[in-house]
Structures are given as structure tokens and as C-alpha cells.
Curated annotation (Swiss-Prot):
Protein family per UniProt: Belongs to the UPF0277 family.
Residues bearing glycans: N44, N72, N99, N124, N135
Source species, domain of life: Eukaryota
Species name: Arabidopsis thaliana (Mouse-ear cress)
Prosequence residues removed at maturation: 175-200
InterPro entries, per the entry: At5g19230-like
Topology of this chain in the membrane: Lipid-anchor; GPI-anchor
Record's subcellular location: Cell membrane
UniProt key word Membrane: yes
UniProt signal peptide: 1-24
Protein name: Uncharacterized GPI-anchored protein At3g06035
Keywords of the record: Cell membrane, Glycoprotein, GPI-anchor, Lipoprotein, Membrane, Signal
Lipid-substituted positions (GPI-anchor amidated serine): S174
Length: 200
């Protein structure tokens, strides 16, 4: 009797191990990307595609603003030419495997919005000095990072000076990690099914 249930048990075990839950996490970054691309569509511009290296830089820049309060002279309200300068900018670029020549034509736009309320976040980019960059057709890619009340948008171009393209793609690294987990799962399933086979 138990041997009759073995194929069903094996099938269910394999099915459970292969079934990887997909987490649907709609966050401020995704909402902002959708809003910016909708805005660009209404301006008859192409949508911006995600750029992982720009996203890395946006995350690192947002981290620099950690615990910095929102004021009338921070973020999108900053007077041009008075933007914060980071002494460790070369190290920030290095963390993302970038250098100054790969980012020269790009644009870094920080905004501070209490609790990152989505409508206000989008307005901080579309109804401020940042709208000039969003309306510029030279930009083709985007990276978004956030920390506390800060959200940073990095725009990229398709030129060598603004492509943010020198980093090793993180997808390759993560695919290797996924493959490693998948291989372990298959080995565990194989060992489990072999054990069950010899047990009965």
C-alpha cells in the first residue's frame, strides 16, 4: 500500500520544491518608474528602461542622504549649483563598478518627500527643475533608489559618457546564485526520493 503512494509523494515533493513563490512587491520605486514613464509618454517621448548600474548608484546616493531631514533647500527645491557634493563620490561610483567618464552625461536627481507619498514623489520630479531632464529625449535609461524619506532618480543616455555600462551585470551574478539553489534543491529531491525508494 505504501509503495502505491510513493509516486504521488515523489511528485508532490518535486512540485513543492520547484514551486518558487513570486513576491509581488509594489514599492515607491516601481510606482515612480510607472509615473515617470506615463509622464514621458504624454510628452511624446520614449519610456525609460531600467538600468541596473544606475539603480546601484541611485541606491548608494540615497544612502548618503540617510537621516538627513527634508528642508526647503534640499532635493528638487535645491537651487542649481548648490547641490550637495560628496567627497566620497569616487568610492560610491566604485561600489557600482562605474567611473566618472561613464556617468558624465547622466543626471542625478534626489528628492525628499515625507513618507514617500507616491503622488508627491512624482510631482517632485515632474513639476520641478527636474522636469527639464525628464523632458530631454537624450535620456533612455533610469535607476531609482530610496532611503528613509529620500528617493533618488538617475537618468542615463545611450552614449558612452552616460550609459553607466561598465558594471558587471548583477543578473548574471544572481542567476548563478539561483542556479546554485536550484541544484541543491534537485540534489535534495534526488536524495529524498532515493531514500524513500529504498525504504519501501
Amino acid at each position: 500500500m505504501a509503495i502505491d503512494k510513493l509516486p504521488l509523494l515523489l511528485f508532490l515533493s518535486i512540485l513543492l520544491c520547484l514551486n518558487r513563490p513570486v513576491l509581488s512587491d509594489t514599492d515607491e520605486e516601481d510606482i515612480l518608474l510607472t509615473g515617470i514613464n506615463s509622464y514621458r509618454t504624454t510628452q511624446n517621448l520614449t519610456i525609460l528602461s531600467k538600468n541596473e548600474n544606475a539603480e546601484c548608484l541611485a541606491d548608494e546616493i540615497a544612502d548618503q542622504f540617510k537621516n538627513k531631514p527634508c528642508t526647503n533647500d534640499t532635493g528638487s527645491a535645491t537651487v542649481p549649483g548648490t547641490e550637495p557634493q560628496f567627497a566620497n563620490y569616487p568610492q560610491i561610483l566604485a561600489k557600482c563598478h562605474l567611473n566618472v567618464s561613464d556617468t558624465r552625461d547622466g543626471s542625478i536627481m534626489p528628492a525628499c518627500v515625507p513618507r514617500l507619498e507616491s503622488n508627491l514623489v512624482l510631482t517632485n520630479f515632474t513639476k520641478s527643475q527636474y522636469s527639464m531632464s525628464l523632458n530631454d529625449s537624450k535620456f533612455t535609461g533610469i535607476g531609482i533608489g530610496k532611503e528613509d524619506d529620500w528617493i533618488v532618480v538617475v537618468l542615463t543616455t545611450n552614449t558612452p559618457e552616460g550609459s553607466y555600462s561598465t558594471a558587471t551585470p548583477t543578473k548574471q551574478e544572481s542567476n548563478g546564485f539561483t542556479f546554485g539553489i536550484g541544484l541543491v534543491s534537485y540534489l535534495v529531491i534526488f536524495m529524498y526520493s532515493s531514500f524513500c525508494f529504498f525504504l519501501f
